[in-house]
Design a protein with these regions (language model features):
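ADP-ribosyltransferase catalytic core
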Residues: 62-130
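Short, surface-exposed beta-strand/loop "edge" segments at domain boundaries and coil↔beta transitions
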Residues: 44-55, 107-114, 131-132
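Weak global preference for isoleucine
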Residues: 7, 54, 79, 100-101, ...
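Charged phosphate-binding loop/patch that engages nucleotide di/tri-phosphates or the phosphate backbone
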Residues: 9, 16, 122-140
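ADP-ribose/NAD+-binding catalytic cleft of ART/PARP-like enzymes
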Residues: 1-69
């Protein structure tokens, strides 16, 4: 389930410690708070995930000037359906990815917002409370 929140209310209730220093306006004012909500993330390897699979674009390329895209660049991309994640693996633009990570997010893990042209794409602003031990690699 995803519950609409104002980021100020979320911060007051959960007192998040973000995984990085957030730029102004990030996370945005209107967010969704997950509660036992499934998401999927593409992984570099087909049989395991690593901490590199959870690096944001901004972490992976810190010298790049992100401009207005910085709020999205510090977040992580998620997909809201396994079927759509599997389809994405077949697209040329995602050829560097070989696997799919299934994860279930809760309020202390951070907030999400639907972003981009595809309704299945979400950006996740992660907190330090997120535990990578609760992830599952899907068979491809």
């Amino acid at each position: 389930m995803l519950t609409p929140y104002k980021i100020a209310d979320y911060c007051k209730e959960y007192q998040p410690e973000w995984t990085c220093t957030m730029p102004d306006g990030c996370p945005p004012d209107d967010v969704l708070v997950p509660s036992e909500h499934p998401f999927f993330r593409l992984a570099k390897q087909s049989d395991t995930y690593t901490t590199d699979d959870f690096k944001s674009y901004a972490e992976a390329d810190p010298q790049r000037h992100w401009g207005e895209q910085l709020p999205l660049a510090v977040g992580l991309s998620l997909i809201d359906s396994e079927t759509k994640a599997r389809r994405n693996l077949k697209l040329p633009m995602f050829r560097q990815y070989q696997g799919i990570i299934a994860l279930v997010l809760n309020p202390t893990d951070g907030v999400v917002r639907q972003t981009g042209a595809h309704r299945s794409h979400y950006t996740w602003w992660r907190t330090r409370k997120f535990q990578m031990s609760n992830l599952t690699m899907l068979k491809i």
